[in-house]
Amino acid sequence: MAQTSVPVYAAGSLRAPLTEVAKAFEAAQAGAKIELVFGASGLLRDRIRAGEPAQVFASANMEHPQSLAASGWGATRAFTRNALCALAPAKLGLKPETLVAAILDPKTKLGTSTPKADPSGDYAFEMFARIGRSANAPQGAQAALEAKALQLTGGPNSPAPPPGKNVYGVLVAQGQADVFITYCTNAVVAVAEQQGLQSIDVPASINVTADYGLAVKQGASAVAQAFADYILSPAGQAVLQRHGFKQP
């Protein structure tokens, strides 16, 4: 049987689970080949708009695939969820209840991804806004956090991640950030890869739920549609949840 290749563009935070999902799908679907392209969702959206041949788009937000509807893409379906955690050296002893004070400390180097290019950065900045609106926040907290945030990943000019390594863990281990606000799933991987790091839960009152959106290009192959359906199936969802993602 001739092989049917399907280009799938996906958020970088999905690298581990979608690689596993793709292998399982290929094993079950004779002749199917899934070509995974990972990156910051906003940058992937721009590449798709510029004409790159994606047939499936798995984004870390709903807005980017929805924005492609006028360009011949189908409806966006929520397929999984994530949340924010803080990644930091364990020696700092951070806890959820001390996290806000720590990141507001002028001495703390605060890392985020790049807003607009990477939804992780957008969610981090929304977290800063929620901190600013909280009853006990110091005056100007939101502006201070936005000004001090080092946008170290996810931008068009960000350094390429080291091959086979979690970029967030590397950045914190190297001291480029004392605290990095990222997805909880990223923080779990970083802690497993780098000794001496810990993941700190962001308090629920200021946390941001990341709804991930899935869309298929109109006119895409039947295999592309089948792969999208497989991601949404119990088998695909089980893989995502095993990697720390939540049900949509």
Q: Model-found features: residue ranges?
A:
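Exported/periplasmic ABC-transporter solute-binding proteins
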Residues: 2-29, 33-42, 46-50, 59-62, ...
